[in-house]
Amino acid sequence: MIENWPKKPEGSQWTDDQWKAVVANGRDILVAAAAGSGKTAVLVERIIKKIINEENPVDVDRLLVVTFTNAAAQEMKNRIGEALEKVLIDEPGSQHVRKQLSLLNKASISTIHSFCLQVIRGYYYMLDVDPRFRIANQTENELLKEEVLDDILEEEYGIEDNTIFFELVDRYTSDRSDDDLQRMILALHTESRAHPNPEKWLDKLVEAYDVEGKTIEDLVYASYLLEDVKFQLETAEQHIRKATELAMLPDGPAPRIETLQADLALLGTLSSAARESWTSVYEAMQNVSWQTLKRIKKSDYNEDIVKQVDSLRNKAKDEVKKLQEELFSRRPESFLRDFQDMHPVLEKLVQLVKVFTERFQAMKRDKGMVDFTDLEHFCLQILSEQSEDGEMKPSAVALQYRNKFAEVLVDEYQDTNFVQESIIKFVTKDSESEGNLFMVGDVKQSIYRFRLAEPGLFLGKYKRFTQEGLGGGMKIDLAKNFRSRHEVLAGTNFIFKQIMGEEVGEIDYDADAELKLGASYPEGEDVAAELLCIQQTEEEVIDGEEGAEVEKAQLEARLMAQRIKAMVDSGYEVYDRKTDSMRPVQYRDFVILLRSMPWAPQIMEELKLQGIPVYADLATGYFEATEVNIMMNVFRVIDNPMQDIPLAAVLRSPIVGLNDEELATLRAHGKKGSFYEVMSSFLKGAPLEEEKELHDKLEWFYNLLQGWREFARQQSLSDLIWKVYGETGYYDFVGGLPAGKQRQANLRVLYDRARQYEATSFRGLFRFLRFIERILERGDDMGTARALGEQEDVVRIMTIHKSKGLEFPVVFVAGLGRRFNTQDLMKRFLLHKDFGFGSQFIDPRKRIKYTTLSQLAIKRKMKMELIAEEMRVLYVALTRAKEKLILIGTVKDATKEMEKWLDAREHSEWLLPDHVRAGASCYLDWIAPSLYRHRDSEMLLELGQGSIPDEIYGYDTSWKVEVVDGNTLLAPEPVQEEKQELLEALREKKAVPLQSERKDEVYDRLMWKYGYEEATSHRAKQSVTEIKRNYQSEEGSDNAFIKKLRAPIKTRPRFMEKKGLTYAERGTAVHAVMQHVDLKKPITVEVLQEQIAGMVNKELLTFEQAEEIAVEKVISFFDSDLGKRVLAAKSVEREVPFTMMLAAEEAYQDWQGESGESILVQGVIDCMIEEEDGITLIDFKTDTIEGKFPGGFEQAKPILETRYKVQLSLYAKALEKSLQHPVKEKCLYFFDGNHVIKVEE
């Protein structure tokens, strides 16, 4: 009980409310923890207090702690572990604490999904599920849904006399496809799974359309819309009252007052009818008649006031007209007929959803996979059973968990959904007044409705629970913020006291909800919050909405860049808690928050132009990367070569290398048919001389393509991808381009994606391509991952959602003028958890469609929920700031917008009028009207206080409100006078003016000469091959004989050559075999071929290289005397790399620099054998000799010896230096002809 709670220790760091949250017991407890209130610390302390309670200690594994993320769960475990270790220092003999530390790793501290998984693993036998199940990949899940749905619809299309189904198709599909119908089925399936009993929720949808024997007054849609009618009529009345006040001013249009009074009477009649019934309002709306305004002489009155009065009256009339057109242009019974007509169609739709759910679950079961919603529903299935009245009650397993858990603690409770709430309910005690559920969160930060989070669960308990906890649960408000300065908190409070209310916003921002100062900061300069509204003039706006958005982003980015640079350059100071002192601001202290990330690239670009380091996790652009795009087209062509666009892209790419002219030539060979058919036909004929090169390129690619297509049918996808990389050489090619490592990494990621795909239930190239398409359709492109340390000095750009839980000294909230995303309200059909299904009434026979009552109600409800969610998102954004908050938005016409924002300036209550808050289309529509009621806006408005209440006008907050001209931001920066002189001198090619005292220094620098000029014309590092060539050139050995020995040099990448291997590639292949051949095995044809195949599998050789190796020549070497010495040697080393210093004059015969200069020489020795009498080095050569010289090998021998003498001498010198043993013999072995040359000094 309350009186038995431990008292707060003297000098405790905890506030009274925090201490209450730590020790309160005996009932369900809801902690409303405002931003920065230390909720995690409170949660950890509560757990520790329970564990080490002297009277009734609880083992940590008897607590269930549910967190929102895995990272939060791990952090919680770490904090509890650290706290227990501190206790152990004070009580080293405590066996209980030691036991808790050992239990901590298996304690139930996890996300709700991890807990569900734990329950399912323990009780899988109660479900029809394979205990070896795996969690499905999201894209795999989508593909399975598509497959199941295609099968169902195909069956439905095949049923004769399937009248209702075809009526459903006629109403909700287009002439081209049934995509809309598929979307409806999938959306209904997804929404139903957010409820504990999906089938029951679906049945209620259908029941709502069964209006037999009902009147319009019985419909939930009509009841809700009547509330909206009252709301809009009240808005109209406010306009007329405001107009009347203006007309009564000394220079107001007094003759208008009589008409305005009649208007109020008319609106009063309508409002009275709205309080009675739908039918009453309908009848009243048919009799609406507005009086005609009396003519007045405008010069007798203040013209501006007359305009305002007439404008306000027109707004009121528009509100009524809108109601007449949307709701009351049809008789009530007409709306009922819509429901009755749509009932059988909706019934069929729900039946399809149920069939889909059943088959989808069966397919997942067959494949041994579950998704995250399955985890929740399977867990709920284990924890519940059906009672006699059809309701769900705890199962025997649930009762076991109730007995096990002393307390269940839920973090971020505001983000819980209905299914998760049911799971928690079944493992906790039934009675709230004697419960063991501890919930902590902040409903003002519930921003995950798109993930089906339900803030209403938190709000319901917050309204139901009391601070004393008498007769039910207890609520505790943690309102003290230990993060931010007074200016940030007061500024946030000032805005939200005016915009967030229960009617519009779902939450009363009352005294309990307000942020209260808990942090102490030293006095700071320029800490006032700011609103910077950028005026974008008509002339600046680029044609098109997209262009205008880009320009807005550029304007805001430039303003932020200027402010950041100015603050850093001026040494703006922020408080450092670690040193307990002020320090100059750094780039890492800034964050730019955006509602979404489309503007991020423009903002990054502007900041970089100003020299400001910046980072944003864009997570886009991977599939747009050139190298990935080209490879995806290759795979599309392998899957189906009849696709013209992918094939043309591959032919034009560096892989095949056709130019525009060659592509046109190919197309000209067959104007009909696909590119592939034309290419096949072209290759069958004999090419013209001028088309031979084109023919060779296409033949090379065509042969590869046929091989890939065959390989794709028999082998794994990942093997195919690596085969394509290898055989085209494209992986190596992109490595040589700018950002080559990144490009290769992108290709490796594609390979990894394929391996991940193959770990799913799908196989094959076609499915993989569809898999990637679904990723792109969902917008799940990937970006380059980058891990940032907390101390990395960059300005961060992130979404407001990503920033939740974080804090920054200086926060920019940008894009406040961007319109809210209302696309979900524009869909052909709407779904709502309470109101079910709503769509237009569509009559395909009469070819008409119109809005239904259900659609209007759901649309209005969703709009109000969207408004509430956007308020909470704004709250999260503003509460990230520790010391400085800067709000930025751009408007097309600031004057026009200001007139709108000033409409409610003199409103007498804290909360702005409902229609102002509900009618907002962007964040500025809330922020600006709020700030224009504060004294700090006077610098901009110069309007005086007027009738604004003192408590609002003089509220204790500091703001800077400014309108910034966009022209000044887009204008080029002025050039300094002295820089201008330099530019003019350069333009006119005159001598550049210099300050006299710097002339000598400039001259000396320009005339300076490097002391080691000779060394600059020679490399500081040389390979042995380069030194050999240098000597050959100096000695004039580049004669006809040597030319005969040299292979033609090809500089183009292999995939751009006609076909076959170069001489160099053949030589590399032979050297690779000589390096890896197993000398312990017999050297036979069969053994060598087996080893070469193994090298291909290990990617030491390509298939093409392996085919070119003459195995018999390798055997000939080992049959020779030299080869036998290798096999018999004490030790054999192959491909021995070395590096050594060599005198420059030894490397360069033309050296004329300082003596004693050295260069670095590196090389690789093919083979070194150690025999009883010393070391022999062997260099393998693949030069073509036979048939090149009239005198045969004897004629070539001296030339070859001269050519390679320097090379072998350097090899020998390197070996002797490193091994400290002389080299007794240096041998050249030529595979062509099986010749050996012993090179003498």
Swiss-Prot record:
Reaction(s) this enzyme catalyzes, per UniProt: Couples ATP hydrolysis with the unwinding of duplex DNA by translocating in the 3'-5' direction; ATP + H2O = ADP + phosphate + H(+)
Every UvrD-like helicase ATP-binding domain range: 12-485
Cofactor(s), by name: Mg(2+)
EC number: 3.1.-.-, 5.6.2.4
Source domain of life: Bacteria
GO biological process: double-strand break repair via homologous recombination
Function statement: The heterodimer acts as both an ATP-dependent DNA helicase and an ATP-dependent, dual-direction single-stranded exonuclease. Recognizes the chi site generating a DNA molecule suitable for the initiation of homologous recombination. The AddA nuclease domain is required for chi fragment generation; this subunit has the helicase and 3' -> 5' nuclease activities.
Subunit structure: Heterodimer of AddA and AddB/RexB.
Protein name (Swiss-Prot/TrEMBL): ATP-dependent helicase/nuclease subunit A
Species name: Bacillus thuringiensis (strain Al Hakam)
